[in-house]
Amino acid sequence: MKIICIGRNYAEHIKELANERPTDPVVFIKPDSAILPKEQDFYIPEFSNDVHYEVEVLVKIKKVGKHIDEKFAHTYYDEVGLGIDFTARDLQSKLKEKGLPWEKAKGFDGAAVIGKWLPKASFKDLGNLDFTLLKNGEVVQKGNTSSMLWKIDELIAYVSQFFMLKKGDIIFTGTPAGVGKIQANDYLSGELEGQELFTLKIK
């Protein structure tokens, strides 16, 4: 399986990092070794002093697809979830300055937190989902999928032009504004439509 991530999919997040607004979805991939095992603490890697949380809505692909038409994209997933795209922001900044890929800053071990999955059918409108990230009990990120520049089905159609999607693949759909630094002993929790889907201790 592979983890396909979308960058710069919320306008306010683009502004907070002073990035240029893209004309097409920004796509990068995390290896499956980036998945943080369930119930395991996240250890800040030695190579970074500025790891940021980025909460994101996730979808899990249920069947093989290539060159998927947007109108059929909804048939390629049944589960929706929530996760964190941990980012070594200091390392990413150095890589961006040199025009190099971001993988070292986003694909390191444990950099992909994947919470519980919920049936897609349990939501009335995937284009209007509230989600939040709390740090030590306080809301630090609050988003709604209505603010996505490219919606879930658009992303599936776009990504499938370049990568064959396979059963079990996971798509991280982008983060809203409010990203920030984590420190040892922080406690993170994520909620989708009021349901807590993950909790996490930082070491």
Residue ranges of model-derived segments:
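Switch II (G3) loop of P-loop NTPases
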Residues: 175
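Catalytic-core "active-site belt" of small-molecule-metabolizing enzymes
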Residues: 1-162, 166, 170, 178-203
